[in-house]
């Protein structure tokens, strides 16, 4: 009796096989396939619903490849039907913009007990050329900046690939950025045909609408963020337009560097679509009311179109027109691949760059998203650290002073430069209360009483200083210093009227003011209620024409124009001059103030 050939099944109690020695092993039905041991696994590239992708190297040829392990979700299902469809379709397609399968691998299961052979299944791998990047990785990488010519190059290749697929009577049904790969030469390839199907009907032609639509298919296709509105509303007899909607989403994503329609549910996805392209109506999509999920149309009743305003800063009018044609609600009015390829967007400057002219991008895949996210955060932190803070301008009256605990006043709405703090020369001087803002345009001279002794120094007040006059009155002075306006009289002849004026200064004995002769007249000369009534400084009485004791000393560089400080209200026009005036070191060392000190000594000697 002849011994039966080895088969995958085992007959343990068959009487006809008792006299034969049977070797329990499966029949080698995959003898032409490669083995996994022929490849060296380098790293994992990604994982999806239908498989795990790994980067590997052929040990013999040293060629880099991508191994896609086909996942069996249940041991009873056998070979995945999606993988069978993908392999069958890819064997019929041959285009430079479509990813090929160059080999298949079957890895036998490791069986310790021969009785478990029926319950153990091997693993299948598809072998395809290694692609250094995918579109998600390029857009997530902060080191890569895509120019318009680069985007046109990618879009042109993508449209050529999808046009070839539609011509061969296939629907891809899963167009998204993660399924668009780019090799080292800049060639774009469409991958992942696990959801692809043959469609029935005429193929699309130029300006003739989509192809297909003669047969019903499942609606559970296309990733939600790239799913067209007809699928969201329950259309089963869809056309090649479902792929063109996904290409429109990818086109917008190339500019925004992130998905443009990120819905959490199908209803939310429909709302985002209506917010972008406008709600469906009798003009934009007349057949929408006949779809099974037409109740979702109520979501778009309050939506307004925002596509032009959202993408106007990112692309030119031709690009917006192409995007609008690809994202048209009505699938029979939507651009097909031939319509898009003949659009003016690809004919105007800048022209699409050739694939071999594209820059050599670094390797980046979807699995690198977290690494790129950390890199972007690091760059943003460095940018914020080096960012120069902007000046704060008040938004309303009184905001500037209120933010600094100052009460509202006539200068409350003007942000001005802060004056320099005065320098102190001895321990007897106390720090003056210097306001944080002043304004020359709203300055009103402080009214003074003309009675004798009314202008004597008063006690320090806790009220904030809000004018130049109060600043001059309350600021610290060096001991024996008198601040005053220059007199038109000769500086060598110090009269009682000119020397008796003590404007904003301090006297060693304030009681002498009662005995001063003609004090009222002297006060009236220098202290008036109007700026126009103040006497103009006499050029002959400047610091260059004072007594001989001041001419002998050589003026310092910062004292060359000290005469400009004689008329405070006329000369101080901006914050720089204000800072110069409040530089107390320069002010007290000026020749004119030395002259005032000399006059004070003569006054004290005369009335002491």
Curated annotation (Swiss-Prot):
<keyword id="KW-0808">Transferase</keyword>
<feature type="compositionally biased region" description="Low complexity">
    <location>
        <begin position="400"/>
        <end position="411"/>
    </location>
</feature>
<dbReference type="InterPro" id="IPR050108">
    <property type="entry name" value="CDK"/>
</dbReference>
<feature type="compositionally biased region" description="Basic and acidic residues">
    <location>
        <begin position="471"/>
        <end position="482"/>
    </location>
</feature>
<dbReference type="InterPro" id="IPR011009">
    <property type="entry name" value="Kinase-like_dom_sf"/>
</dbReference>
<dbReference type="InterPro" id="IPR008271">
    <property type="entry name" value="Ser/Thr_kinase_AS"/>
</dbReference>
<dbReference type="InterPro" id="IPR017441">
    <property type="entry name" value="Protein_kinase_ATP_BS"/>
</dbReference>
<dbReference type="GO" id="GO:0005634">
    <property type="term" value="C:nucleus"/>
</dbReference>
<keyword id="KW-0547">Nucleotide-binding</keyword>
<feature type="compositionally biased region" description="Low complexity">
    <location>
        <begin position="487"/>
        <end position="502"/>
    </location>
</feature>
<keyword id="KW-0067">ATP-binding</keyword>
<dbReference type="Pfam" id="PF00069">
    <property type="entry name" value="Pkinase"/>
</dbReference>
<feature type="region of interest" description="Disordered">
    <location>
        <begin position="443"/>
        <end position="571"/>
    </location>
</feature>
<protein>
    <recommendedName>
        <fullName>Serine/threonine-protein kinase BUR1</fullName>
        <ecNumber>2.7.11.22</ecNumber>
        <ecNumber>2.7.11.23</ecNumber>
    </recommendedName>
</protein>
<comment type="function">
    <text>Serine/threonine-protein kinase involved in transcription regulation. Phosphorylates the UBC2/RAD6 ubiquitin-conjugating enzyme (E2), leading to monoubiquitination of histone H2B and the silencing of telomeric-associated genes. Also required for histone H3 methylation. Necessary for the recovery from pheromone-induced growth arrest in the cell cycle G1 phase.</text>
</comment>
<feature type="compositionally biased region" description="Acidic residues">
    <location>
        <begin position="559"/>
        <end position="571"/>
    </location>
</feature>
<feature type="region of interest" description="Disordered">
    <location>
        <begin position="383"/>
        <end position="419"/>
    </location>
</feature>
<dbReference type="GO" id="GO:0005524">
    <property type="term" value="F:ATP binding"/>
</dbReference>
<keyword id="KW-0723">Serine/threonine-protein kinase</keyword>
<feature type="compositionally biased region" description="Polar residues">
    <location>
        <begin position="539"/>
        <end position="548"/>
    </location>
</feature>
<dbReference type="GO" id="GO:0030447">
    <property type="term" value="P:filamentous growth"/>
</dbReference>
<feature type="binding site">
    <location>
        <position position="68"/>
    </location>
    <ligand>
        <name>ATP</name>
    </ligand>
</feature>
<feature type="domain" description="Protein kinase">
    <location>
        <begin position="39"/>
        <end position="346"/>
    </location>
</feature>
<dbReference type="InterPro" id="IPR000719">
    <property type="entry name" value="Prot_kinase_dom"/>
</dbReference>
<feature type="compositionally biased region" description="Polar residues">
    <location>
        <begin position="503"/>
        <end position="512"/>
    </location>
</feature>
<feature type="active site" description="Proton acceptor">
    <location>
        <position position="174"/>
    </location>
</feature>
<dbReference type="GO" id="GO:0004693">
    <property type="term" value="F:cyclin-dependent protein serine/threonine kinase activity"/>
</dbReference>
<keyword id="KW-0539">Nucleus</keyword>
<feature type="binding site">
    <location>
        <begin position="45"/>
        <end position="53"/>
    </location>
    <ligand>
        <name>ATP</name>
    </ligand>
</feature>
<keyword id="KW-0418">Kinase</keyword>
<dbReference type="GO" id="GO:0106310">
    <property type="term" value="F:protein serine kinase activity"/>
</dbReference>
<comment type="similarity">
    <text>Belongs to the protein kinase superfamily. CMGC Ser/Thr protein kinase family. CDC2/CDKX subfamily.</text>
</comment>
<dbReference type="GO" id="GO:0008353">
    <property type="term" value="F:RNA polymerase II CTD heptapeptide repeat kinase activity"/>
</dbReference>
């Amino acid at each position: 009796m002849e011994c039966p050939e080895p088969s995958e099944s085992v007959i343990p109690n068959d009487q006809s096989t008792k006299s034969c020695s049977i070797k329990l092993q499966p029949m080698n039905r995959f003898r032409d396939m490669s083995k996994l041991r022929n490849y060296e696994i380098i790293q994992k590239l990604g994982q999806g619903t239908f498989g795990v992708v790994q980067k590997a190297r052929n040990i013999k040829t040293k060629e880099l490849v991508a191994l896609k392990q086909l996942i069996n979700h249940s041991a009873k299902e056998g070979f995945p039907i999606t993988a069978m469809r993908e392999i069958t379709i890819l064997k019929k397609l041959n285009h430079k913009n479509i990813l090929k399968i160059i080999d298949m691998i079957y890895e036998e299961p490791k069986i310790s007990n021969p009785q478990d052979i029926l319950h153990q299944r091997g693993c299948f791998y598809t072998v395809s050329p290694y692609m250094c990047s995918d579109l998600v990785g390029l857009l997530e990488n902060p080191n890569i900046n895509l120019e318009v010519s680069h985007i046109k190059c990618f879009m042109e290749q993508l449209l050529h690939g999808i046009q070839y697929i539609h011509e061969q009577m296939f629907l891809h049904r899963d167009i998204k950025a993660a399924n668009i790969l780019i090799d080292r030469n800049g060639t774009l390839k469409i991958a992942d045909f696990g959801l692809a199907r043959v469609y029935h009907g005429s193929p699309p032609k130029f300006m003739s609408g989509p192809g297909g639509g003669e047969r019903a298919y499942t609606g559970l296709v296309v990733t939600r963020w790239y799913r067209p509105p007809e699928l969201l509303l329950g259309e089963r007899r869809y056309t090649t337009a479902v792929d063109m909607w996904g290409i429109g989403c990818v086109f917008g994503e190339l500019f925004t560097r992130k998905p443009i329609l990120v819905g959490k549910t199908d209803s939310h996805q429909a709302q985002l679509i209506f917010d972008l392209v406008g709600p469906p109506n009798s003009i934009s999509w007349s057949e929408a009311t006949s779809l099974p999920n037409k109740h979702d149309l109520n979501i778009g009743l309050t939506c307004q179109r925002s596509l032009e305003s959202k993408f106007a800063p990112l692309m030119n009018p031709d690009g917006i027109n192409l995007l609008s044609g690809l994202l048209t609600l009505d699938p029979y009015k939507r651009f097909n691949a031939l319509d898009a390829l003949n659009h003016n967007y690809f004919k105007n400057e800048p022209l699409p760059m050739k694939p071999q002219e594209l820059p050599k991008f670094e390797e980046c895949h979807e699995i690198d998203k977290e690494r790129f996210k950390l890199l972007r955060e690091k760059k943003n932190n460095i940018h914020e650290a080096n960012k120069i803070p902007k000046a704060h301008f008040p938004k309303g009256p009184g905001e500037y002073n209120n933010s600094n605990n100052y009460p509202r006043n006539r200068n409350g709405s003007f942000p001005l430069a802060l004056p320099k703090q005065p320098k102190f020369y001895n321990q007897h001087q106390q720090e003056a209360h210097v306001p944080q803002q002043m304004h020359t345009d709203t300055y009103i001279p402080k009214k003074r009483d003309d009675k004798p002794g009314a202008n004597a120094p008063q006690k320090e007040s806790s009220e904030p200083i809000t004018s130049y006059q109060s600043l001059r009155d309350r600021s610290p002075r060096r001991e024996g210093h008198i601040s005053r306006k220059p007199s038109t009289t000769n500086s060598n002849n110090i009269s009682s009227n000119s020397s008796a004026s003590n404007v904003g200064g301090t006297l060693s004995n304030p009681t002498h003011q009662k005995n001063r002769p003609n004090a009222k007249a002297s006060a009236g000369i220098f202290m008036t209620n109007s700026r126009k009534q103040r006497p103009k400084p006499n050029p002959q009485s400047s610091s260059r024409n004072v007594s001989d004791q001041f001419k002998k000393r050589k003026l310092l560089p910062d004292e060359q124009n000290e005469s400009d400080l004689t008329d405070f209200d006329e000369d101080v026009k901006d914050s720089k001059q204000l800072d110069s005036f409040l530089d107390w070191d320069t002010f007290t060392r000026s020749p004119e103030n030395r002259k005032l000190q000399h006059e004070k000594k003569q006054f004290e000697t005369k009335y002491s």
